[in-house]
Amino acid sequence: MYQNLAIMIIMLPLASSVINGLFLKVIDTKLAQIIATGFLSLSALFSLVIFCDAGLDGNIIHIKLLPWIEVGNFKVNWSIYIDQLTSIMFIAVTWVSSVVHIYSLGYMAEDKGIIRFLSFLSLFTFFMLMLVSADNFLQLFFGWEGVGVCSYLLIGFWYSKESANKAAIKAFITNRASDFAFILGIITIIVYCGSANYKDVFSSAELLSNTKIFLQFSILDVICLLLFIGCMGKSAQIGLHVWLPDAMEGPTPVSALIHAATMVTAGVFLVARCSYLFEYSPLVLQFITIIGGVTCLFAASIAIMQSDIKKIIAYSTCSQLGYMFMACGVSAYNSGIFHLVTHAFFKALLFLSAGSIIHAVHEQDIFKMGDLRNKMPVTYGNSLIGSLALIGIYPLAGFYSKDSILEAAYSSGSFMFIFGIAAAILTAIYSMKIIMLVFYGKTKLEKDVFEHAHEPAKIMNTPLILLVAGSFFSGMIGYYLLSMDKPNGYFHESLFNLHIYKLLISHPPLYIKLLPMAVGIMGIVIGICVYNSSTIMSFRPSSMSFPRKRESSKPFNLVYNILHNKYYFDEIYNFLIVKPINCLASLFYLGDQKIIDRFGPNGFSRVVNCFSVLTGKTQTGYVFNYALYIVSFIVVVISVFVWKG
């Protein structure tokens, strides 16, 4: 029974996508909505059953569906592998996806492309489920690339908008750059292990770590580094994060799905799944810790200066992913996945609440909003719960999972603990920035827009109850019932930790355990003080019409410009990569047009045309001309024979 349910969990979203996609022109909109939401809801319910068997009871479900690749001794089967890690990912992916599908029925109700949209959402979910249930690297890569293609389709869903098309292309190309490293990593694995199956590769980890290729670097270090670069692109870590804010051009439900439980978490999942490899590569683990710690602070600092509500939450996602990678870097994979699961619920709640606000006021700039708490009390409550969970306030989910990460970072002696604490303060500040500017103060909306602002339809608000429940209880369940914060807890059979005893014997002092929430409360107070004044320190250009404090000092302006322009990453990449490539492309274009085409196909065609024109002029229609041609030909022939002989 469990095997059949496991197959249905993955195939139901695919069936939904295929039915709605193939019969796009003929299927009734209501029927398409029922199929999409019904199939995804069934998938979510079945994932609960699988969680009870594979997750709670620890039974591994391994189904070999069919042979896929067979070349000599190299064999890969198309399989489904479900253990404790996969089962918890099933819960996060299917439940958040189901809520997003239902929410979309209201949000996209007036959009003519809603059936196409639902088809893309379902396909996205299928590829993510395929990714997390793979038992080999090639099948994982299939799901990995699948979510990349679907993100391109969803970000650019409104293809008539030039900005949406550019954002989709940017996301696609950025991920292709990182995926190139990922492909090289998989190829290296196959070359050195002779297999792509997890079991075979993981059993070779220690041997690979002893195979030195340059100084102290082993082939395993190279493999792990290449795999992690792939993760950096997919999970928007510093340097490869530039696609993330632009991805907000897609419909808001897309943002909730991509940035909560699916595509961006794939990188964290991969590092956790490959813990058997990474544990034997301490150099790469240190690199992961640094990248994660720097990203969580870097992205949080950018979020402070943003004014677009969706971009603030997007950079928040980037920051929280940094926390997850920091946990993996200090070998606390369990804490990283724990935060991944809790984050899926409260981040989806924040995105969909933002969608309700945008749907009501048709505006994304939080500095143009205000005083909406009485107009939209349910949305206000949802946003507040999501924000407090993100900050890590007891007893909400983020309190348990984020604290687990910071405690592990402290116990490992990593300096990134300081970065994590600093990011926690900034997280509280930008979360309060949204709450105070959107729901409090004097509204800056036009009078008729403000008067007509209201709660969205029940079909949009009702499913958010599940996310509210997840934001409240997922942390408690994970901490008290499943012991996800402990390396020998829920994930002890799925994740590998070479030095598990170090984490087990470490007991951070009480003040370290309380510090994250303390700095979170401090950040809340700062946020309220800064954004609740009649003279808001808005950190906006001086051209804005609403009040701001007197001109700041040059150092402040410098910091403001750096953060407001997102550390100039886009400008740097444009100068170093985009412009040189465009110049090279122009050079090749000129070479193609002026040289190859001119003297090649176009030149040859011009010669033929010229010859045909000259030949055509000989066809005068006069008999005496033709007689002249014949006589001339005879004279030439006779002359040749005479000359030769």
Swiss-Prot record:
Record Pfam families: Proton_antipo_M, Proton_antipo_N
Q: Name one GO cellular component term.
A: plasma membrane
Q: Which Gene Ontology terms describe the biological processes this protein takes part in?
A: ATP synthesis coupled electron transport; electron transport coupled proton transport
What the entry lists under Gene3D superfamilies is as follows: 1.20.5.2700
Catalytic activity annotation: a quinone + NADH + 5 H(+)(in) = a quinol + NAD(+) + 4 H(+)(out)
InterPro entries for this protein: NADHpl_OxRdtase_5_subgr, ND/Mrp_TM, NU5C-like, Proton_antipo_N
Enzyme Commission numbers on file = 7.1.1.-
Entry keyword set: Cell membrane, Membrane, NAD, Quinone, Translocase, Transmembrane, Transmembrane helix
Q: List the disulfide bonds.
A: none
Please state where this protein is localized: Cell membrane
Transmembrane portions of the chain = 7-27, 31-51, 88-108, 114-134, 137-157, 177-197, 213-233, 252-272, 284-304, 312-332, 337-357, 380-400, 415-435, 464-484, 510-530, 623-643
Q: Which molecular-function annotations from GO does this UniProt entry contain? A: NADH dehydrogenase (ubiquinone) activity; quinone binding
Instruction: Tell whether Nucleus is among the UniProt keywords.
Output: no
Membrane topology classification: Multi-pass membrane protein
Give the record's family classification.
Answer: Belongs to the complex I subunit 5 family.
What's this protein's function?
A: NDH-1 shuttles electrons from NADH, via FMN and iron-sulfur (Fe-S) centers, to quinones in the respiratory chain. Couples the redox reaction to proton translocation (for every two electrons transferred, four hydrogen ions are translocated across the cytoplasmic membrane), and thus conserves the redox energy in a proton gradient.
Q: What is this protein called?
A: NADH-quinone oxidoreductase subunit L
Annotated gene: nuoL
